[in-house]
Amino acid sequence: MHSIRILSALIILISPFYLNAQVQQTRTIFYGGESREFLIYVPSIYNPSTPTPLMFNFHGGGGNGMGMMLSTNDMRPIADTANFIAVYPSGSGGAWMHKAPTTYNDIYFVEAIIDDLASEFNIDNDRVYACGYSEGGIFSYELACRLSNRIAAVASVSGSMMTDTYRTNDYGFPACSPSHPTAVMFIPGTIDMNPHSMYSGLLPYYMSASDISNYWKNHNNTAQSPIIVSVPNTNTSDGSTVDRKTWENGDNCVSVVELKVNNGDHDWPGTFGNMDIDASQEIWNFVSKHDINGLINCNSTSTSNYNRLDKKNLVKVVDPLGRHYNLQRNNIQFLLYDNGLVEKRIILN
């Protein structure tokens, strides 16, 4: 498959060489007989001499890349400090999953985007990640299944995984066959009644949350039983809580993580629905630990360190009422980390 970039609509550009400039572009490539759009965000700290990760974000059915960024999963503030390029493609007709026979094969559209960006930016090809909401989450699983030679790790929010029977018989896709151990995070809601994201699944079409964890823990050869940690219920008004379930010690040190939103609906936690976690930050904290070869700096003789208390990433800061805010002096604040640890802190002048 070949891509020809025919348009780059520049929204913000300070330097033509992308040095010390925030860049947000809507770009277009000619693919599959039509012009296809995707949005990119390049943080000001991007350095052309440093290989930089890509983070794909896929919208839900009926959406588009801009809407995904503005109303669901805005990863720009995270990219500004973590230094990755955020990519928001738009699906044809607002969809990612097209049944055979069809001229749309968005798996290779994504590959065309990777190649297009790699021709202009210094992309770390070992650190290309994908996440999505609803149908975009389902599509992220498809990338892990069918483009695993380019995708290091994936995450899905409120989107299930298709069964192989449904994938092959109805869509004409090959069976899921990842080529390497793949770190996977998924964030389902237990009362989500959308057919393609029900916690209990919808056989023979979509897997349950248990089926998804079973598939990936078996593929990755992780521990069979998860470590379960209750996430602090910092927002008691959202009507939901979160349990973190981690299957550790997989091949190449990869893990599988489920952030189970008890009483959660078809939501993106941190934006709407549950507010105890920020799904965007959780996803980046998780996938960024991995490259195409597994956990970065993996030591195969030791256990995965994702849940060790000395290995933690700050998720958010809240006041005693659970409200988000930045670190402040002379106030009580609670620092929430991705391993379940909560620190109470007062910074004095």
Predicted regions and their residues:
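A domain-start/cap signature at the N-terminus of enzymes
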Residues: 19-54, 85, 102, 131-155, ...
